[in-house]
Regions:
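Active-site core of PLP-dependent enzymes with the aminotransferase class I/II
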Residues: 1-3
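Bacterial carbohydrate/catabolite-sensing allosteric modules
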Residues: 6-7, 11-235
């Protein structure tokens, strides 16, 4: 949570009510969380593109102040850094910089459909030799695919694409989109079980000022991957 959302969140926590964050983590203050391996998911997606021979791989990222966006961007960079061939190809584009928006192969889509479309156009115009793109959020995936259609780009002949989440949308796109999937049902079950456990603990004790930092729990879940027809083998 950030900005106005964080203020509401802080007030809620101070009231003593149990809180479970889903796919978010607080930087200042401990809180129960249910998280997926966002870093690993992005890393795996980019590695899949590399195995197909892609070297110039763009990424449409989310906002800097969102935990999941930072983790997915980290996974993207780790995958590129682990490949000495890709690292040499993209050396000038992946240098550590104070402002990540200076990186040509990264474009911020702000986790929105419109943002995804705008970021896709920017990547395409700034990187004419880009052969693949990883889109790190569902809404941005929708926007990016809309822009790809508007630009007349053929997938995967001209550009390979891996999106994020929503199996139904991935199946509706032509060609079928390869996507990272999140265990939505497991996330909901884990969050509900954790919250119920906290409510039971609260009922069993009269001490409402107990130290939450000693009892917070983080549950990690793995993502999946659905192979479509949107990635070309250019190796």
């Amino acid at each position: 949570p950030s900005g106005a959302e964080k203020k509401v969140f802080d007030r809620f926590r101070k009231s003593g009510r149990p809180v479970v964050l889903i796919d978010r983590r607080m930087e200042n203050g401990d809180c129960d969380c249910v998280l997926v391996d966002n870093e690993g998911a992005a890393q795996n997606a980019v590695k899949r593109l590399m195995k197909k021979g892609h070297k110039k791989i763009g990424m449409i990222t989310g906002p800097d102040n969102v935990y999941t966006a930072r983790e997915r961007q980290r996974g993207y960079k780790l995958a590129l850094q682990e490949s000495s061939k890709a690292q040499s190809e993209q050396q000038s584009d992946l240098k550590d910089k104070t402002d990540r928006k200076d990186t040509k192969l990264l474009a911020d889509g702000n986790y929105t459909i419109a943002g995804g479309a705008k970021a896709m156009r920017k990547l395409y115009e700034d990187n004419p030799d880009m052969t693949a793109v990883f889109i790190s959020n569902y809404e941005m995936t929708v926007g990016a695919m809309m822009e790809i259609n508007d630009l007349g780009i053929k997938v995967p002949e001209q550009l390979s694409v891996i999106g994020f989440d929503n199996v139904d949308f991935a199946r509706a796109v032509v060609p079928r989109l390869s996507i990272v999937t999140q265990p939505t049902e497991e996330i909901g079950q884990a969050a509900a079980n954790l919250l119920l456990s906290r409510l039971e603990d609260k009922d069993e004790t009269s001490d409402k000022t107990s130290d939450k930092t000693e009892t917070t729990e983080t549950i990690w879940l793995k993502t999946g991957f659905v192979e479509g027809e949107s990635v070309a083998d250019i190796s």
